[in-house]
């Protein structure tokens, strides 16, 4: 019997996932599992013949789990595939829901035409985080799954450019970090500096970023550089519970905690000059600001409310109860879709209000108007969302409900749903790294529309749970290392810094390069942090 091998480079090193909310992250010992050689790696013998390795892809054959409607796929290079092999061994030995199994499980859902995972994918609640699952809507059984969107509905990221150079802010870095930390509340349960009335909050859930434009908190031009123009239709606040609203209405303009962040960054390298120029980014050293956050307590409560409702309905009983959903066109399906859109609109407004505060902070410290500093929005993208989109399936254009959970929409040049400013280059996809590491801007490709339903990665992706990170790293060491890099760090709870250390994540450069090699997106530029604000 062959013994399992975790890595060509790091034999025997244990890797650990992070789970969402209710899923345990307890580290367990891995009993010996009978394995076979698979392209130079060891995988469980029970998967013999059920996987196929292709360039930058792992194909999961129909039959990997019972009831699959077709093959499933994970985009990965050899090093990223190596992380998946250990998960698969734990899956067999400890009934561990690996990313591979979760991607296969999602392929059993009614109406599914694609179950994919991006290179940054890891196990999550039901769907893997990094998953893209599409169902064709001409199938009346096609489902929508709250767990397939996740608890942080429209967690997303936006990038703001400036005409400033690094030297323009270098001497102001500490004060600018302090001002941003003061202006933008961060951490668990934080409340906004501006409290909207319940009536206004309903308007925010309906209008999204438009509400901020009407009330002077956002610029008109921000709308065209935001996915869905910052407002998703079919959003009925009456379908959002009172408890969900009570968790959200005082949180417009707050960062939250966990992996959410605000970074002042500098352009480190430009790979595609023309695409960068279309985004208003013209040279290395240019200062930008990246914001990563979502729908806060509102989204979490809406997700939980509708997971509970779906489980009680008994309409859909999948292979994994965490995948429970309902037919998209059923009453409950449409209610969840509308409530989800309310949360998405809130998240657009949340990032918009944070942008308002960022512009104020820069004006306070640098004594220049935001317009003079060219503080325009490059783009704002969703990471956790389900959307109705047109895609080609079996050589026919059909309407699909596409779940993206920890994945970024990345539509190609000339796609009708992207801004006129980006028609020639494709939709920007903003990809954040782990704390203290670089981030990237990508654009979508025509090949990506065919291979990944117009989707790409969303970040680095965890390889170590929060519990494991806290056990193996000290927050003091993590903070000191970031300071030694010349980065100004402000963090609400310093004790939790180890959870977000770069060792807990995959290499974001490897992730985006895999996406490019797979043809699903193209790298435009790289940024590195000067200031990091964390919850």
UniProtKB/Swiss-Prot annotation:
Mn(2+) 1 binds at residues 152, 155, 260. SUPFAM superfamilies: Hypothetical protein PH1602 (SSF103365). The active site is at 458 (gmp-histidine intermediate). It catalyses: a 3'-end 3'-phospho-ribonucleotide-RNA + a 5'-end dephospho-ribonucleoside-RNA + GTP = a ribonucleotidyl-ribonucleotide-RNA + GMP + diphosphate; a 3'-end 2',3'-cyclophospho-ribonucleotide-RNA + a 5'-end dephospho-ribonucleoside-RNA + GTP + H2O = a ribonucleotidyl-ribonucleotide-RNA + GMP + diphosphate + H(+). InterPro entries: RtcB (IPR001233), RtcB-like_sf (IPR036025), RtcB_euk (IPR027513). One of its GO terms (biological process) is tRNA splicing, via endonucleolytic cleavage and ligation. Binds 2 manganese ions per subunit. Residues 1-29 are annotated as: Disordered. GMP binds at residues 259-263, 383-384, 432-435, 439, 458-461, 534. The keyword 4Fe-4S does not apply. It holds the Pfam family RtcB. GO terms for molecular function: GTP binding; metal ion binding; RNA ligase (ATP) activity; RNA ligase (GTP) activity. Ligation probably proceeds through 3 nucleotidyl transfer steps, with 2',3'-cyclic phosphate termini being hydrolyzed to 3'-P termini in a step that precedes 3'-P activation with GMP. In the first nucleotidyl transfer step, RTCB reacts with GTP to form a covalent RTCB-histidine-GMP intermediate with release of PPi; in the second step, the GMP moiety is transferred to the RNA 3'-P; in the third step, the 5'-OH from the opposite RNA strand attacks the activated 3'-P to form a 3',5'-phosphodiester bond and release GMP. Belongs to the RtcB family. Catalytic subunit of the tRNA-splicing ligase complex that acts by directly joining spliced tRNA halves to mature-sized tRNAs by incorporating the precursor-derived splice junction phosphate into the mature tRNA as a canonical 3',5'-phosphodiester. May act as an RNA ligase with broad substrate specificity, and may function toward other RNAs. This is RNA-splicing ligase RtcB homolog 1.
